[in-house]
Design a protein with these regions (language model features):
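Donor nucleotide-sugar binding/catalytic pocket of nucleotide-sugar-dependent glycosyltransferases
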Residues: 90-127
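Conserved acidic donor-binding segment of nucleotide-sugar-dependent glycosyltransferases
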Residues: 264-265, 269-276, 285-290
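Conserved catalytic-core segment of nucleotide-activated headgroup transferases in glycan assembly
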Residues: 1, 121-126, 132-214
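Active-site proximal beta-strand in glycosyltransferases
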Residues: 28, 49-66
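Nucleotide-sugar-dependent
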Residues: 149, 199, 203-242, 252-260
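A charged, aromatic-enriched C-terminal amphipathic alpha-helix characteristic of glycosyltransferases
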Residues: 274, 290-326
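C-terminal alpha-helical cap of glycosyltransferases
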Residues: 310-347, 367
Length: 369
């Protein structure tokens, strides 16, 4: 889109760059950090990156303080990683994030923040729906290996679903991201298969970040459970966006960034953490009324594709790149019409690359990914 205006180069290790090469860089773009630590090294490395006048922009899609239930919490605590990431946020010339909620936290450390929502690019084939059909209504969970507490929200509802014999052979539950030998997904499987008792369960293999969305072609309804805690409230609405682009219905936890996108009962379903029975009731209603699922999916797709225009958001991002490189402040930039979101209307310290070629497997079939 901007090939005539800029040249983008992917650098595997900046330490291998010569001074001559460093002089050619106007702007460094980093996801969360430019160095993993220690904290004492963050500023010296930033100074090296800037020594010939280059600027630094961070992309931030997750909060840097993890809850005690997060699978990375121990690692973050032992390595002081939350402080390391916060130091990066403070020192960056500008920060890009995805929602007003996370922006408000970043503003406490860095005033140069702008919002560029997650939006799929159709040049990536995985975002072009190639739906499959089934006589059963198919539910799917697409989450990385850091959601043990979130998946636990489904344990009782899915157990009740399994025990409802009026629904037998009328639905499927797919766990996407299955990775043979991964203990987290083995735990997830215990929930989705009701400890092996649900015959309506199957797997979708793990895939990398460039193909995992293809797994949506084998489901009809996405499940997006999240605990209502600060870390999760500062995540993006990515799971809603994925479902919308793939023209799927969604049942999601009633967490702020999801609630900004979904009108409960119209273009999706929102479930309060204190109402776990609603997961079961909503899934049963969808199994009994598949036409409702199709209507919800179409409404969600129309809404989200209207809200998230790739050209507008990409232009906003590129204008930010140009103006930071030219040393125009974010305050000045925001005075220029950019299509910036005006209110809370808009993944993860999560490894989105832990899924595979998107082909469903039987419950007992191994994955070779």
């Amino acid at each position: 889109m901007f090939g005539s205006e800029a040249e983008f180069v992917s650098i595997a290790d900046v330490r291998t760059m010569s001074d001559e090469e460093l002089r050619t860089i106007d702007l460094f773009l980093y996801n969360r950090t430019w160095i993993a630590g220690p904290i004492e090294a963050v500023k010296p490395v930033a100074d090296i990156l800037r020594q010939y006048g280059a600027k630094i922009i961070l992309d931030m899609d997750d909060y840097w303080h993890l809850g005690t239930g997060h699978s990375f919490y121990k690692h973050y605590h032992e390595t002081n990683m939350s402080a390391v990431v916060a130091e990066h946020v403070k020192l960056a010339d500008a920060v890009i994030t995805t929602t007003t909620y996370l922006r408000d936290e970043i503003l406490k450390l860095n005033k140069n923040v702008t919002i560029c929502e997650n939006v799929p690019h159709l040049l990536y084939d995985q975002f072009k729906p190639q739906p499959t059909t089934s006589e059963r209504l198919r539910f799917g969970y697409f989450g990385a290996a850091q959601h043990t507490e979130d998946v636990a929200l489904l344990e009782l509802p899915l157990s009740r679903l399994c025990d409802d014999h009026t629904l037998e052979n009328r639905y499927m539950l797919y766990l996407a991201g299955w990775n043979e030998g991964n203990p987290i997904y083995q735990q997830y499987e215990q929930v989705f298969s009701n400890k092996g008792k649900n015959n309506n369960y199957g797997r979708i293999q793990a895939a990398d970040i460039y193909s995992y969305v293809g797994g949506y072609n084998f489901i009809d309804v996405a499940l997006a459970p999240l605990r209502d805690n600060k870390f999760n409230r500062l995540k993006s609405e990515l799971k809603v966006t994925e479902a919308a682009w793939m023209n799927k219905a969604i049942i999601a936890s009633n967490v702020c960034m999801y609630a900004d996108c979904i009108q409960d009962g119209w273009d999706g379903v929102l479930v309060d953490e204190k109402q776990p029975k609603k997961w079961y009731k909503s899934m049963k209603a969808m199994i009994n009324e598949p036409a409702m699922v199709r209507e919800m999916a179409d409404r969600l797709t129309a809404k989200m594709q209207k809200r998230l225009d790739i050209d507008t958001i990409t232009r906003r991002r590129f204008n930010l790149y140009k103006n930071v490189a030219r040393d125009i402040s974010i305050k000045e930039l925001h005075a220029i019409p950019q299509g910036e979101p005006k209110q809370h209307d808009s993944g993860d310290v999560d490894g989105a690359g832990e899924q595979c070629d998107g082909l469903p497997l039987a419950a007992d079939e191994p994955c070779n990914a």
